[in-house]
Each structure stands twice: as structure tokens, then as C-alpha cells.
Amino acid sequence: MQRPSGRNPQALRPIRITRRYTKHAEGSVLIEFGDTKVICTASVVAGVPSFLRGQGQGWLTAEYGMLPRSTGTRMDREAARGKQQGRTVEIQRLIGRSLRAAIDLNALGENTIHLDCDVIQADGGTRTASITGAWVALADAVAWLKAEGRVTDEPLKRAIASVSVGIYQGVPVLDLDYPEDSAADTDMNVVMGDDGGIIEIQGTAEAEPFTEAEFAAMLSLAKQGIGQLHQLQQQALSH
């Protein structure tokens, strides 16, 4: 089996995390998974949604979008269509759920963190790149809250990262790019914390069901890849 990129089955694409990518947001990152590039920002807003007011806890929510020419052919902006696509809603809910597992909302106080993930170039794995980059932006936003004296306890509980795995030409592979994703027998997205806890698994067989052994092999690959991503996140935060 030869991957289109020439990578071995256990290899991530080249990963690059650039912090402070924009100047206004409390946390901002450009994350690159090969040719997939996503800008992730974390914005702090005083106050919480009405269903949480007066409870002394914070909130975290996420939005996701793709630039019209982030793909091979131009897409209309969702604002021009007048509604979000189901895929967009699904992905931004996934990002929000995943990153809420990273934070102690009680320690956040009555503050809201908005995560915005905007895909500027797509080559597969946009949701996994968004989650991985958004955590770094979140960490910077939390550091800002602490520096401003708006929180006293540590809100961050764990690091969160995500990667795709799949069965391509009968072989479990890590971090699928678009040519692999579009031809894969099985595609799975895994979100995990740096404590080894599993936060979410999304897996789909395209034609034939995958076996329990294949599932275990994919999960093992994902755990390995996410471990590498956690190291890259910490390296980015150290600079």
C-alpha cells in the first residue's frame, strides 16, 4: 500500500502551530496539518448565556466555517445562503463539546470564551485540526484571564487534541488527507485528553463494516498521533 503523500501508515502530516496569529483575540493560532490550514481564535467576553446567569460559572462555545475558496471549487458563503449547513453545525458542536472537556467552567467565573475556527485551506481533517489548534488558543485566553486577575483558580484541566484515522486500501492509517479520506474504506475522528481519556470517537464505514480488530488498530494509531500532537501543543506554548 502506497499513501498518496508517500507517508508511512503511522505518520502524521507536517504539523505547524503559530501562536499570536491575530492581534485582537485573547488567544489566536494558525494551525497547519499539511495543506490543511485553520485560524483558531479564542475571545473572552464578560458574562454568560441567560441559562447560566447567577450561577457563578462560565461557558465555552465554538463556531466553525470555511472560506469560499478553501477547497478546489468556490463555495457560497453560508451567510449568503441564509443558513448554516448541517455539516457546519455538527462540526462546531463537536469543537465546543471537545474543548469544554478541557476546562473547569466553575473556575472560569461568569466569563464566556468564544472559539472561532475558520478554515482557510482544506485538505482533509479540518475538524481535527480545528480542535487541536483551538486548544492552544484557549490556553492563551486562559493565561490572559489569569494575568488580568479575572480568574483565581486554574480553569484548564487537560490538554485536548484530535486526529483522524482510517482504513485505506485495507491498511489502518493515521491523519488522512483529502485524497485518502475520499477513498477510505473507513474514516474515524478521535478526540483525546493528555491524560489518555477518550472524549469523542466518530467512525463510519463507507462500504463494508470494519472489524473490532481494525477498530482497535485505528484507536491505537490515534492515541499515538494524539500523543505527538500534545507534545507539539506544549512546544508551541513554550515559545
Curated annotation (Swiss-Prot):
It is an enzyme of class 2 (transferase). Keywords: Nucleotidyltransferase, RNA-binding, rRNA processing, Transferase, tRNA processing, tRNA-binding. Phosphate binds at R87, G125, T126, R127. GO terms for biological process: rRNA catabolic process; rRNA processing; tRNA processing. It holds the Pfam family RNase_PH. GO terms for molecular function: 3'-5'-RNA exonuclease activity; tRNA binding; tRNA nucleotidyltransferase activity. Its EC number is 2.7.7.56. Coiled coil: none annotated. The keyword Methyltransferase does not apply. It catalyses: tRNA(n+1) + phosphate = tRNA(n) + a ribonucleoside 5'-diphosphate. Homohexameric ring arranged as a trimer of dimers. PANTHER family: EXOSOME COMPLEX COMPONENT, EXOSOME COMPLEX COMPONENT RRP41. Belongs to the RNase PH family. Phosphorolytic 3'-5' exoribonuclease that plays an important role in tRNA 3'-end maturation. Removes nucleotide residues following the 3'-CCA terminus of tRNAs; can also add nucleotides to the ends of RNA molecules by using nucleoside diphosphates as substrates, but this may not be physiologically important. Probably plays a role in initiation of 16S rRNA degradation (leading to ribosome degradation) during starvation. HAMAP family: RNase_PH. This is Ribonuclease PH. It comes from Cellvibrio japonicus (strain Ueda107) (Pseudomonas fluorescens subsp. cellulosa).
